[in-house]
C-alpha cells in the first residue's frame, strides 16, 4: 500500500539531524530575509528594489519577506528531495525496500508523497517563524500592522502561502526525479543547483533571451510570486508550464524506476 511506503519513508525523514536542520534552517533563512527587508526599507519610495515602510504597511506587507525567500526555499526543497531519493541507491537500501514492497509504482508514489509532505511542513514552519519576525520588525520600525489582519490582508497571506507551497511541491518533485535518474546524491544536488542557479540564467543571457516563459525554474518562481513582472509571465502560464514539466518528469521517473535493475 502507498500508506505503508509513505510511513516507511517518514521513518527516515523524521531523524533529528534531517528534520531539525531542514526546519530550523529554512526558518532561520526566512527570518533573515524578513529582518533584512524591514531593516533596509526606506520611509518612502524604494531603495535598491526593496519595499518602503509605507508599502510594508499595506495588506500584503506581511508576506514580503517570505516571498523574497521563496527561491531559497525551493533550492533547499530540491536538494533535500534529490538527496533522499539518490541516497537509497548509494546506501544500498532500495533493494531492501523492494523486498518488502515489490510493487515499484506503489513504493515510488509513497516516497514522493512523503518527501513532498515533509518539505511542505518545513515551509509552513518557516512561514510561521517569518510572520512572527515580521510582526516584531514592524513594531521596531514603526510600521502599522492593522492592514495585515483585515480580510484583504489575510486573503493575501493565504494566497501567497498557497503559491509558495505549490512552488515547493514542484521543486521537491523535480529533485526526486533528478535523484532517481542520477542515483547519486552529490551529483543530483550539483546538477540541480547548477541548473537553477547558473544554467537558466546562462540560457537567458547568452543563448535564447526569450526562453524565460518556458524554463522550469522560472515557471516555479512565477507560481511562487503570483506572476513574474520582470519577464512578463502570467501566473496561469507559469502554472501550465510547470505542471507540464512535472507530469513528464513523474512519468519518466516512474517508467525508469519500474524497469531499472537494482543490484545493490
Where are these regions (language model features)?
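Aromatic- and glycine-rich beta-strand/loop motifs that create alpha-glucan
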Residues: 1-28, 183
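Transmembrane helix segments
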Residues: 32-39, 182-218
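Secretory targeting signals
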Residues: 19, 23-84, 108-180, 198, ...
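Junction motif at the cytosolic side of a transmembrane helix
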Residues: 241-264
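Helix-capping/transition residues at the boundaries of transmembrane alpha-helices
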Residues: 12, 86, 97-99, 175, ...
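Membrane-interfacial segments
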Residues: 40-45, 86-89, 93, 133, ...
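Membrane-helix interface segments
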Residues: 17-19, 103-105, 109, 184-186
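Transmembrane helix boundary and interhelical loop/hinge segments in multi-pass membrane proteins
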Residues: 78-105
